Curated annotation (Swiss-Prot):
Protein name: Fibroblast growth factor receptor 4
Quaternary structure and partners: Monomer. Homodimer after ligand binding. Interacts with FGF1, FGF2, FGF4, FGF6, FGF8, FGF9, FGF16, FGF17, FGF18, FGF19, FGF21 and FGF23 (in vitro). Binding affinity for FGF family members is enhanced by interactions between FGFs and heparan sulfate proteoglycans. Interacts with KLB; this strongly increases the affinity for FGF19 and FGF23. Affinity for FGF19 is strongly increased by KLB and sulfated glycosaminoglycans.
General function of this protein: Tyrosine-protein kinase that acts as a cell-surface receptor for fibroblast growth factors and plays a role in the regulation of cell proliferation, differentiation and migration, and in regulation of lipid metabolism, bile acid biosynthesis, glucose uptake, vitamin D metabolism and phosphate homeostasis. Required for normal down-regulation of the expression of CYP7A1, the rate-limiting enzyme in bile acid synthesis, in response to FGF19. Phosphorylates PLCG1 and FRS2. Ligand binding leads to the activation of several signaling cascades.
Ways its activity is controlled: Present in an inactive conformation in the absence of bound ligand. Ligand binding leads to dimerization and activation by autophosphorylation on tyrosine residues.
Residues bearing the modification Phosphoserine: 571
Domain Ig-like C2-type: 17-115, 148-236, 245-345
GO molecular function per UniProt: ATP binding; fibroblast growth factor binding; fibroblast growth factor receptor activity; heparin binding
UniProt lineage: Eukaryota, Metazoa, Chordata, Craniata, Vertebrata
Glycosylation (residues): 109, 254, 286, 307
Gene3D superfamilies in UniProt: Immunoglobulins (2.60.40.10), Phosphorylase Kinase, domain 1 (3.30.200.20), Transferase(Phosphotransferase) domain 1 (1.10.510.10)
UniProt PTM comment: N-glycosylated. Full maturation of the glycan chains in the Golgi is essential for high affinity interaction with FGF19.
Extracellular side: 17-367
Native source species: Rattus norvegicus (Rat)
Length: 800
């Protein structure tokens, strides 16, 4: 009999439930009650798990409650000499005895009571098992998970730039401590750009603005004197890659409506970059759906606003027969465009019942139709191929209602107004387009004309443009000075000096697409005093010209260096300006204007990604204008070690998250603005002079920043340091920068600081990367973060 009971006991030893949240949550030996044989009272909190051993020898011991032996399975169980309660409830209170098998000797005699004064274990306060003055002994517990159900998500896959939070809520008595490991090594975040936040009271680890280098296994280790438990999370950071908008398949969908009803067409757009969305309706002009060049006529029904959330839905109220036809959702960003189409069928009201009956009848014969259509599929395909070939020869355009029609004929859309013969004006907007080949010849050698659609809002007559001397050039493009007659419509006989961007003869299709993309981006962004504005385009009967504002005084770096005061350590690269040195308010004004331009670009959801003094142009009236904000830069193909044509290293203007992980945001532009501030107050100095690139990387990771330039007030240096905070979220916004610089402008006057004084021993003319940095001439401040509080109204940088 005893043998049979022993065998049954062995088979029943498998737990019916587990106190662990995963296989990685280690089970430690359970504690024994404090005393043996003597009666003991333990106070337990509601919801707390209980695990007690019956003496030093667990074999041959059984637990009883109120005289009844506990089963070896269930929420409350006694097995292998252990008393286990998964979650303590009021009905679990009472007297428990541990008896030795055979002799029935009382090994333990204890009473469990629930103390309502104790916080529930559901409370996230880890001090659940604090001491009490009631005289009762509180249950000593090895660490345990209080909310294992919240820890079930092991894999966290998030886009770069997001915030990640790992939680391991636990409790125990004595109160356990928590430590974090990354890939098996102690993790304190000291080498992570932006640092980490450890919230021990919430058992959590928080990392802001994650980057691909944050990938790995993160383990929480919770321990006290009675044991330890651990749990691991896997973090995968998905690197953002620039791409054109993605449209959800099947949307917009074909729709059938009745005259007088309302219709909604939905277009779901996914895009990292701010998309520009248009709803288009295909229309007929003079009996034709297509122009002479084969491109469709399209009416623009709805266009996105910068803050619009309703543009993805096209609402058609009280539809009529004229509303029937093909509708297209067109979405574009700085990378490219995507579009999908659907058909709207409008039925007369009296045909509604007939249509329903017909649809029901058709559904009954669906199977028959499928079989028949399958047998005729080959014949139909041959017929369609013949019809298509005939249409291609004769230029006949036939339209068929399909669920999604990919209109490859107008990937680049332009809007213009159709002039009516009767009134001279029309509210009807048309879009026509051109296809850029991605499979044709790689070069546009000998290009003399480009078949781009006419855009009367921006088209400028080519014969009124006289090209002059080159202002700058790259491998495949160039900028020339030009004279434009009648650019100002109010003064048609006046000539204006402009700058014209164009392609060289050896430009590729990709270069052409980039120039068109820049042109479209400038159209979408609009006008502002502190950016280079688009004035017009030449797209007809010749090469593509993009006409922009002309800046007579060149870029800001040259402007600053030409106005350096005389001295042994400051000398201009070229001829010294006759206008003399700049005053301190003039320098602050330069920074203020650039900040205003960047604030506007930020409001238009435009990330510059290459903000530097060389990309800020200066007009004849000393107005700062940000340039090259519409360029489509391939950030995944940047050679970070390659110098630019003028010898400067782009990496020196890049934020750490952009430099190391290629994450570009408005806050990475703020970092670059801080470098630009440094350029301004060194009068065009080269950042990090004498610092090799390899050393620069490690210095930035360690938190080192450039020291204060000579004659730069501590307030403005504090502003630079705020821009250089390691955590992107802790940097100021451009709106805050504009407000801070505006206050400085109001406070200063011409007598505040005269830069005609000779500068200190620092020379910004040092080499960029050829020499090494010694301790005596280092431009780095070796304190990782500001030593004094920021005078500006945004969060102060904190040491990480």
């Amino acid at each position: 009999m005893w043998l049979l009971l022993a065998l049954l006991s062995i088979f029943q030893e498998t737990p019916a439930f587990s106190l662990e949240a995963s296989e990685e949550m280690e089970q430690e030996p359970c504690p024994a009650p404090i005393s043996e044989q003597q009666e003991q009272v333990l106070t337990v909190a509601l919801g707390q798990p209980v695990r007690l051993c019956c003496g030093r020898t667990e074999r041959g011991r059984h637990w009883y409650k109120e005289g009844s032996r506990l089963a070896s399975a269930g929420r409350v169980r006694g097995w292998r000499g252990r008393l286990e309660i998964a979650s303590f409830l009021p009905e679990d209170a009472g007297r428990y005895l541990c008896l030795a098998r055979g002799s029935m000797t009382v090994v333990h005699n204890l009473t469990l009571i629930m103390d309502d004064s104790l916080p529930s274990i559901n409370n996230e306060d880890p001090k659940t098992l604090s001491s009490s003055s009631s005289g009762h002994s509180y249950l000593q517990q090895a660490p345990y998970w209080t909310h294992p159900q919240r820890m079930e998500k092991k894999l966290h896959a998030v886009p770069a730039g997001n915030t990640v939070k790992f939680r391991c809520p636990a409790a125990g008595n004595p109160m356990p401590t928590i430590h974090w490991l990354k890939n098996g090594q102690a993790f304190h975040g000291e080498n992570r750009i932006g640092g980490i936040r450890l919230r021990h009271q919430h058992w959590s680890l928080v990392m802001e603005s994650v980057v691909p280098s944050d990938r790995g296994t993160y383990t929480c280790l919770v321990e006290n004197s009675l044991g330890s438990i651990r749990y691991s999370y896997l973090l995968d950071v998905l690197e953002r890659s620039p791409h054109r908008p993605i449209l959800q398949a099947g949307l917009p969908a074909n729709t059938t409506a009745v005259v007088g009803s309302n219709v909604e067409l939905l277009c779901k757009v996914y895009s990292d970059a701010q998309p520009h969305i248009q709803w288009l309706k295909h229309i007929v002009i003079n009996g034709s759906s297509f122009g002479a060049d084969g491109f469709p006529y399209v009416q623009v029904l709805k266009t996105t606003d910068i803050n619009s959330s309703e543009v993805e839905v096209l609402y058609l109220r009280n539809v009529s027969a004229e509303d029937a036809g093909e509708y297209t959702c067109l979405a574009g960003n700085s990378i490219g465009l995507s579009y999908q189409s659907a058909w709207l069928t409008v039925l007369p009201a009296e045909e509604e019942d007939l249509a329903w009956t017909t649809a029901t009848s058709e559904a009954r014969y669906t199977d028959i139709i499928l079989y028949v259509s399958g047998s005729l599929a080959l014949v139909l395909l041959l017929l369609l191929a013949g019809v298509y070939h005939r249409q291609a020869i004769h230029g006949h355009h036939s339209r068929q209602p399909v669920t999604v029609q990919k209109l490859s004929r107008f990937p680049l859309a332009r809007q213009f107004s159709l002039e009516s013969r009767s009134s001279g004006k029309s509210s009807l907007s048309l879009v026509r387009g051109v296809r850029l080949s991605s499979s044709g010849p790689p070069l546009l050698t000998g290009l003399v004309s480009l078949d781009l659609p006419l855009d009367p809002l921006w088209e400028f007559p080519r014969d009124r443009l006289v090209l002059g001397k080159p202002l700058g050039e790259g491998c495949f493009g160039q900028v020339v000075r030009a004279e434009a007659l009648g650019m100002d419509s109010s003064r048609p006989d006046q000539t204006s000096t402009v700058a014209v961007k164009m392609l060289k003869d050896n430009a590729s299709d990709k270069d052409l697409a980039d120039l068109i993309s820049e042109m479209e981006m400038m159209k979408l962004i609009g006008r502002h005093k502190n950016i280079i504005n688009l004035l017009g385009v030449c797209t007809q009967e010749g090469p593509l010209y993009v006409i922009v504002e002309y800046a007579a005084k060149g870029n800001l770096r040259e402007f600053l260096r030409a106005r350096r005061p005389p001295g042994p350590d400051l000398s201009p690269d070229g001829p010294r300006s006759s206008e003399g040195p700049l005053s301190f308010p003039a320098l602050v004004s330069c920074a203020y204007q650039v900040a205003r331009g960047m604030q506007y670009l930020e409001s238009r959801k435009c990330i510059h990604r290459d903000l530097a003094a060389r990309n800020v142009l200066v007009t004849e009236d000393d107005v700062m204008k940000i340039a090259d904000f519409g360029l489509a830069r391939g950030v995944h193909h940047i050679d970070y070690y390659k110098k630019t044509s003028n010898g400067r290293l782009p990496v020196k203007w890049m934020a750490p998250e952009a430099l190391f992980d290629r994450v570009y945001t408005h806050q990475s532009d703020v970092w670059s603005f801080g470098i630009l501030l440094w350029e301004i107050f060194t009068l065009g100095g080269s950042p990090y002079p004498g610092i090799p690139v390899e050393e620069l990387f490690s210095l930035l990771r360690e938190g080192h920043r450039m020291e204060r330039p000579p004659n730069c007030p501590s307030e403005l240096y504090g502003l630079m340091r705020e821009c250089w905070h390691a955590a992107p979220s802790q940097r100021p916004t451009f709106k805050q920068l504009v407000e801070a610089l505006d206050k400085v402008l109001l406070a200063v006057s011409e007598e505040y600081l005269d830069l005609r004084l000779t500068f200190g021993p620092y020379s910004p003319n040092n080499g960029d990367a050829s020499s090494t940095c010694s301790s005596s001439d280092s431009v780095f401040s070796h304190d990782p973060l500001p030593l004094e509080p920021s005078p500006f109204p945004f969060p102060e940088a904190q040491t990480t």
